[in-house]
Amino acid sequence: MKKIYDMLKLENIKILPGVKDWREAIHVAVKPLVDGGYCEERYGDEIIKNTEKLGPYYVLCENVALIHGSTEQGVIKRQIAITLLKEPVKFKEDGYDVRI
């Protein structure tokens, strides 16, 4: 069984000034996973499709979103990436500000 610290690599942690919108936030958040071979290129687009269909169900609370997907959406191996935004982004107009 993989331990959580085995699924979080230093190269998958990013601190960024901000993004233009929630779609860009998803793409920059999954980029380290794509680059590392943990998911397919389409992974970010699949999460965006789910968000457009179901809403931002992964926004847990103020400042925190836990975007995720499945093998059907392009996940190859389990891995965690953390993206910290200095300027928050909203995943819906009346929703929480998200930084992580």
Where are these regions (language model features)?
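Cytosolic covalent-transfer regions centered on His/Cys nucleophiles
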Residues: 1-100
